[in-house]
């Protein structure tokens, strides 16, 4: 009792669930109090009208009802206040329980003769409501139910045990009462256990759904950052839609296209300035760096450039080795795009100048800028990189190549847009770049107004750095200085976004303390500022689970019927399996068994009743056998084959809604029928019939005089009130089928209400009159009270149980549907989350190789440091289509070059499709540079792995690259056939050590660096159309693998001097494999 009135809730598994459970039970509690108040209001005029009495004739009943009306109205007011209810749930529940007990004992000891069967139904109502409608835990509810039962038995046993006239039939009646209370406790506990299980399941589904939503939100943020790190927003949305379509269709490759062309995501923009910048002297410096130093240096340098680009409204396009190029005026047009690029170029030169002065390392910056129009977008299927194409882009590239270190080199078009913002001087380009010399247009060098001041300030620092440089490598000195710039690391945002992803992330307990109302209109000021978005969403979830929501407009449910608004969802709900049906049937059998025991205790057990019960028992055993037949699987398998189908009956019941509804309805009707069996088979005495006809016409006054002495002993009238109690148990049997539809429960309850009231108020009302005549046959007895007459008492309790169970049925229906809805939402969200995760992985693998992506995603993310990896043997391929430069033109016919890029997109996309073939799984696409395709093999090997294996095995992937190059030529031949062109492939191969890494926080980019890469690029640029040119070392490695190579001789290679190169003995213009010796 002390625990029940404690203001603090008992410790529970989950404080979140306690808050949710408290809210879910508020509605049944309010309904219980409302039913009691309404019954008190209706009882007075209804009873007076039904019995033909005046209210003043029964002052005890009138007083008790008025006290109940006042007391429970006060409790209703307290329970309707949400904040107080959450804080004082247990004390208020205890107070209601005590008030119900007091009301029950008030009815028991007022209004006439006290009998053993008196107010048993009301105490049964108390017991059931303690379990089903009061917000108590199972232990508290069980304690209250047992105390209510024992108190009634002990009080009546002690009170009636001293009365000689009551002792003869007292023991069977008390035993019948005990069976009734035991059944009520079991049914109540069973109902509560089912509801709590359903509530907890719904809560867990909702909580899982919340975590899924947060995870989904995180994945969406990942995608947003990943896409925007590769593409502009307008292009990201368009391409994301296509990827989602692929993933939802279960296809990793592109969907079938009716026009046989790959999707082209390229648009033309005018009024754009393009900046190319190259770090002069970096190649020599990089050769002295360790892999970690090289990647750190590049990331810091290009991170600084990205920062400068952002300040001047420029967008970096791509990083090509140590070359950086960007544009201004994309994707939105900017009037000052030329000024933006010039300012950025000057700031880049200043940054490198400061670096040179501070470290003493001889590096410089060469910048070229041109203004015009571009085609911008993405081509290919893999390793997307936003790029720009046009003659103006080519000119900007040559402006950088023909520029002066430390200066910004601009064209006349850019100069015209500067409008005198900067002073310039004429540039001498005759001896620098053939393209510019052939163009014949004048170019200019921008004069930096702050260059002289910075040079003077940096002289002292430069001398100091030069002294330190004598004891420190230039690369190390450079690295240490660049670390002070603090450039962001690639994909650093992923770690910040991952905090809410884990489903085990707890939410703050303060957000769910009972004194905090979940009504957002009452949320304390400043609370929203303290809670993060996830917590606010959890408040919304709790509110959505509130049982009061069933009476409010919902986008998922129909307000009146609770049907799902989506017909397909309603169909799925009704067809869903119900494995727990067998337990519903088993508990209903307990109610049936209780009715049987009660009737055997209080009736004369006529043969017809025994025969009927025997048949009903057989039907029930058959029903239970069908429901639990799956537990006989092992036994049946050992028996004859003709019995192997028996376990399928249980599955049939669980999965077939029609069969299940039929069995459930039949079970309840059996309980209904047998509840009144004793009444139907009650023997009739002519004396009792005579009495009944006279009693009904007697006018009841304060002193009731009976017409003579009548033999009533032969009639077992004591079974009349117990038949009424059995009818009440029949009502309770409907509550056991938790997943039975509300409309069916309504129909069965209404049917049983009409049948019960018809029996007790009409066809068999005379039996109640006989019992009253028996109890009040002495002239000294006062008139019986309203709740002392079985027929009136039964009708009142029938209506009370009818409305109570109807409300519970609607609540059960709401939670069953809500549980189904949350499970469906959770499945959808998990599928969507899985799709989003796959999309994130696909996007990340579109930026990074598959073996590098796990470094930045998943639970073992290691992006605290820059990713870098050195390899001893990597084969690098450069494959270009030089003829495309001549093919490309800009005219109205080809939409200013757009149709030319459409063909290039087909070429690159067909090349990309080769990567999905298993034989080329080891080939990694690095990037495309115009019409040049760069790829590498050997990057999926771990560092140092090559040195631990023999040379032949370590370079075996060179053969894969050769096969890939031949496949590229075959693909190009097919495109030539369909496009009526004669493009030819020029390929350069080289193998050796490289450094791989990821650089750039704004647009992370995976790249490889080293002499091997530079020489491979030279092998392509100095190669011959239709041939694969390789270095001498690579030729020897290929010959060891069985390929035939022949010498081309010595050629002059920029930056390398004279090199002896070889051609692979194959023709890329024909489909086939290279010849092998």
Curated annotation (Swiss-Prot):
Query: What is the reaction catalyzed?
Result: ATP = 3',5'-cyclic AMP + diphosphate
What is any one GO biological process for this UniProt entry? adenylate cyclase-modulating G protein-coupled receptor signaling pathway
> Which of the residues bear the PTM Phosphothreonine?
533
How is the enzymatic or functional activity of this protein modulated? Activated by forskolin. Insensitive to calcium/calmodulin. Stimulated by GNAS and by the G-protein beta and gamma subunit complex.
Q: Name the membrane topology term.
A: Multi-pass membrane protein
How is the cofactor bound, in the record's words?
A: Binds 2 magnesium ions per subunit. Is also active with manganese (in vitro).
Transmembrane segment boundaries: 29-50, 61-80, 94-117, 120-138, 141-162, 170-190, 583-604, 608-630, 661-684, 718-738, 746-766, 793-809
Disordered: where is this region?
A: 503-524
Task: Give the cofactors, semicolon-separated.
Answer: Mg(2+); Mn(2+)
Give me the residues that bind Mg(2+) 1, please: 278, 322
| GO MF, one annotated term | metal ion binding
Q: Which domain of life is it from?
A: Eukaryota
State the similarity comment.
Answer: Belongs to the adenylyl cyclase class-4/guanylyl cyclase family.
Q: What is this protein called?
A: Adenylate cyclase type 4
The organism of origin for this protein: Mus musculus (Mouse)
Q: What is the phylogenetic placement of the source species in the record?
A: Eukaryota, Metazoa, Chordata, Craniata, Vertebrata
């Amino acid at each position: 009792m002390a625990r029940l009135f404690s203001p603090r809730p008992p410790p529970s598994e989950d404080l979140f669930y306690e808050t949710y459970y408290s809210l879910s039970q508020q509605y049944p509690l309010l309904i219980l109090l409302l039913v009691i108040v309404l019954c008190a209001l209706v009882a007075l005029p209804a009873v007076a009208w039904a019995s033909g009495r005046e209210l003043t004739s029964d002052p005890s009943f009138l007083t008790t009802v008025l006290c109940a009306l006042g007391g429970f109205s006060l409790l209703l007011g307290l329970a309707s206040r949400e904040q107080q209810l959450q804080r004082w749930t247990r004390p208020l529940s205890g107070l209601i329980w005590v008030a119900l007990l007091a009301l029950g004992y008030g009815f028991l000891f007022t209004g006439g003769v006290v009998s053993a069967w008196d107010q048993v139904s009301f105490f049964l109502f108390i017991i059931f409501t303690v379990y089903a409608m009061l917000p108590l835990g199972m232990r508290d509810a069980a304690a209250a139910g047992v105390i209510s039962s024992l108190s009634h038995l002990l009080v009546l046993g002690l009170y009636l045990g001293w009365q000689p006239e009551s002792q003869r039939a007292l023991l069977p009646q008390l035993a019948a009462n005990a069976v009734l209370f035991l059944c009520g406790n079991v049914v109540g506990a069973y109902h509560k256990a089912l509801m709590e299980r359903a509530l907890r399941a719904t809560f867990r589904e909702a909580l899982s759904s919340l975590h899924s939503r947060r995870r989904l939100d995180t994945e969406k943020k990942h995608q947003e950052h990943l896409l925007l790190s590769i593409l502009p927003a307008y292009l990201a949305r368009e391409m994301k839609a296509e990827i989602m379509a692929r993933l939802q269709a279960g296809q990793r490759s592109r969907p079938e296209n009716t026009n046989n062309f790959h999707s082209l995501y390229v648009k033309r923009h005018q009024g754009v300035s393009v900046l190319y910048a190259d770090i002069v002297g970096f190649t020599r410096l990089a050769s002295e760096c360790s892999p970690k130093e090289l990647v750190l240096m590049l990331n810091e340098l290009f991170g600084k450039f990205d920062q400068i680009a952002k300040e001047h409204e420029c967008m970096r396009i791509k990083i090509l080795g140590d070359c950086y190029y960007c544009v201004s005026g994309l994707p939105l047009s900017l009037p000052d795009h030329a000024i933006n690029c010039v300012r950025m170029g000057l700031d880049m030169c200043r940054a490198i100048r400061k670096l040179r002065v501070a470290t003493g390392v001889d590096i410089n910056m060469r910048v070229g800028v041109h203004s015009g129009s571009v085609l911008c977008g993405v081509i290919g299927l893999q390793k997307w990189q936003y790029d720009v194409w046009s003659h103006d882009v080519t000119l900007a590239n040559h402006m950088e190549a023909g520029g002066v270190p430390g200066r910004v080199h601009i064209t006349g078009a850019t100069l015209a847009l500067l409008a005198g913002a900067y002073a310039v001087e004429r540039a001498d380009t005759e001896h620098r770049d053939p393209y510019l010399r052939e163009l014949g247009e004048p170019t200019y060098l921008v004069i930096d107004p702050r260059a002289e001041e910075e040079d003077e300030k940096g002289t002292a620092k430069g001398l100091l750095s030069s002294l330190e440089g004598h004891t420190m490598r230039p690369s190390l000195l450079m690295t240490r200085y660049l670390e002070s710039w603090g450039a962001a690391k690639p994909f650093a945002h992923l770690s910040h976004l991952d905090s809410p992803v884990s489903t085990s992330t707890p939410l703050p307990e303060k957000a769910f303390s009972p004194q905090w109302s979940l009504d957002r209109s009452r949320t304390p000021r400043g609370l929203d500022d303290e809670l993060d978005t996830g917590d606010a969403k959890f408040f919304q979830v709790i509110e959505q689970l509130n049982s009061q929501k069933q009476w409010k407009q919902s986008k998922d449910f129909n307000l009146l019927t609770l049907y799902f608004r989506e017909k397909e969802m309603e169909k799925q709900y009704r067809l869903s399996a119900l494995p727990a049906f067998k337990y519903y049937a088993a508990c209903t059998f307990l109610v049936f068994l209780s009715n049987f025991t009660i009737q055997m205790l209080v009736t004369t057990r006529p043969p017809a009743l025994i025969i009927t019960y025997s048949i009903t028992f057989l039907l029930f055993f058959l029903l239970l056998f069908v429901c639990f037949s799956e537990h006989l699987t092992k036994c049946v398998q050992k028996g004859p084959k003709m019995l192997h189908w028996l376990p399928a009956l249980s599955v049939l019941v669980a999965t077939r809604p029609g069969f299940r509804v039929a069995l459930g309805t039949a079970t309840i009707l059996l309980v209904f029928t047998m509840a009144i069996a004793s009444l139907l088979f009650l023997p009739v005495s002519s004396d009792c019939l005579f009495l009944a006809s006279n009693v009904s016409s007697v006018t009841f006054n304060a002193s009731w005089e009976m017409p003579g002495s009548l033999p009533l002993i032969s009639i077992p009238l004591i079974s009349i009130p117990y038949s009424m109690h059995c009818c009440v148990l029949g009502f309770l049997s409907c509550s056991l089928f938790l997943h039975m539809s509300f409309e069916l429960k309504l129909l069965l309850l209404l049917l049983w209400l009409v049948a019960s009231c018809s029996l007790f108020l009409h066809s068999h009302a005379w039996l109640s009159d006989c019992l009253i005549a028996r109890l009040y046959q002495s002239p000294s007895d006062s008139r019986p009270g309203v709740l002392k007459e079985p027929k009136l008492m039964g009708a009142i309790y029938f209506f009370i149980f009818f409305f109570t169970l109807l409300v519970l049925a609607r609540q059960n229906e709401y939670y069953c549907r809500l549980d189904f809805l949350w499970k469906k939402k959770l499945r959808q969200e998990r599928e969507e989350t899985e799709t989003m995760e796959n999309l994130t992985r696909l996007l990340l693998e579109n930026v990074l190789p598959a073996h590098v992506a796990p470094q930045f995603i998943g639970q073992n993310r290691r992006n605290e440091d820059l990713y870098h990896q050195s390899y001893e043997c990597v084969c690098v391929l450069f494959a270009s289509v030089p003829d495309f430069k001549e093919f490309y033109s800009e005219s109205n016919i080809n939409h200013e070059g757009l149709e030319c890029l459409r063909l290039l997109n087909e070429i690159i996309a067909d090349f990309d499709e080769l990567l999905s073939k298993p034989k080329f799984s080891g080939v990694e696409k690095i990037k495309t540079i115009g019409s040049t395709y760069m790829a590498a093999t050997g990057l999926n090997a771990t560092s140092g792995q090559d040195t631990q294996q023999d040379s032949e095995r370590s370079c075996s992937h060179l053969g894969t690259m050769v096969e890939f190059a031949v496949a590229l030529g075959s693909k190009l031949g097919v495109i030539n056939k369909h496009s009526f062109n004669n493009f030819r492939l020029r390929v350069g191969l080289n193998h050796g050590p490289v450094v791989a890494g990821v650089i750039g926080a704004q647009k992370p980019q995976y790249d490889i660096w080293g002499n091997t890469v530079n020489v491979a690029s030279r092998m392509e640029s100095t190669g011959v159309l239709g041939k694969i040119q390789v270095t001498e070392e690579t030729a020897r490695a290929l010959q060891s693998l069985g390929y035939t190579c022949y010498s081309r001789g010595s050629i002059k290679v920029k930056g390398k001097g004279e090199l002896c190169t070889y051609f692979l003995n194959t023709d890329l213009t024909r489909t086939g494999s290279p010849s092998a010796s």
